[in-house]
């Protein structure tokens, strides 16, 4: 018969020091370590608090649409309607993500990707880039013309996600909240509305390949890119919360819009009424509808993934002049600062600025063409000034821009 001990050795919690008589339960661990139920509960509370903090950290600090536009105004000139539309769309997108992290409603909030329509150099890429900078999220740019559907020579659509991963330093969680801008999206339009028997590898096929990414899927991304490393382990990226912004000039869609509205020919000798004149104005693209984009060559399913469409205006001379001088990172400010490092004052005459703007319009390059123009004007000055210590001021004139005449140099006074 087993002998019952007269007393059991008292056990103490290794963490709080309480005895087994003071708590409900003490659990034994290896190496004579014990923990009581109270310390277990306390540890669980600490863990829960840390998880709550980690979850809160995933909630993006989100500026209001007014704040977003105010910050965009520091860098982007004009395009007021587009800025407002983008600010609201981006705010709602990230508000939706924050809601998914800490749900307060059982309503399913769906993603709204964005399409930007506007001429070359109107600021489509720069707007998307500026939004990502304001929100401090990873950003990547892709060129739709380089994409092909799987099985053909070219770039797989998954490589777009790879660029975003690279921008996020392969932080998958950060990348999954990033922004991707796909440029030249109009170049992957179908060649005709009728489905061709032959494969359109750079048109409808690419649109089909992009569909899943835009709506949200677990994309298998090759970390080394391309198809050169078939054995590489793939990275899984959920695109559900990635905001896709696509942009294109959509040259010729204005004609499609006019035809839909019954204004086939507006010009000399036409009986156009006041409404027709309005439709022929520069704001014709503001009347764009999904059916126009379908007729242009985008498939309905693809358009359906882009519920927000905004139009950018063609930039005028006044806009381009302001772009040269007003933003925080304006080109004129940059070159003035560069010459200032050599103790030389740089001045652009107003007529010179206007001439550069007119040249950009003449070349149909818009804002993106301004840098090459100013680089050409400044090349010799930037080459010579570091070797001279007698120049006090450089003045860029209209003739410097239009005719390549050397800028005016003001020399330092001797003695």
From Swiss-Prot:
Keyword annotations of the record: ATP-binding, Chaperone, Metal-binding, Nucleotide-binding, Zinc
Cysteine pairs bridged by disulfides in the record: none
Record's GO cellular component terms: HslUV protease complex
Keyword Nucleotide-binding carried by entry: yes
PROSITE patterns in alphabetical order: CLPX_ZB (PS51902)
Gene3D superfamilies xref list: 1.10.8.60, ClpX chaperone, C4-type zinc finger domain, P-loop containing nucleotide triphosphate hydrolases
Positions bound to Zn(2+): 13, 16, 36, 39
Molecular function GO terms recorded: ATP binding; ATP hydrolysis activity; ATP-dependent protein folding chaperone; protein dimerization activity; unfolded protein binding; zinc ion binding
SMART domains cross-referenced by the UniProt entry: AAA, ClpB_D2-small, zf-C4_ClpX
Xref: InterPro entries: AAA+_ATPase, ATP-dep_Clp_protease_ClpX, ATPase_AAA_core, Clp_ATPase_C, Clp_protease_ATP-bd_su_ClpX, ClpX_bact, P-loop_NTPase, Znf_CppX_C4
CDD domains: RecA-like_ClpX (cd19497)
Domain ClpX-type ZB: 1-55
GO biological process, one term: proteolysis involved in protein catabolic process
Residues that bind ATP: 119-126
Pfam family of the protein (one): ClpB_D2-small
Similarity annotation: Belongs to the ClpX chaperone family.
Function: ATP-dependent specificity component of the Clp protease. It directs the protease to specific substrates. Can perform chaperone functions in the absence of ClpP.
PANTHER family (alphabetical): ATP-DEPENDENT CLP PROTEASE ATP-BINDING SUBUNIT CLPX-LIKE, MITOCHONDRIAL, ATP-DEPENDENT CLP PROTEASE ATP-BINDING SUBUNIT CLPX-LIKE, MITOCHONDRIAL-RELATED
Assembly information from the UniProt record: Component of the ClpX-ClpP complex. Forms a hexameric ring that, in the presence of ATP, binds to fourteen ClpP subunits assembled into a disk-like structure with a central cavity, resembling the structure of eukaryotic proteasomes.
UniProt name for this protein: ATP-dependent Clp protease ATP-binding subunit ClpX
Originating gene: clpX
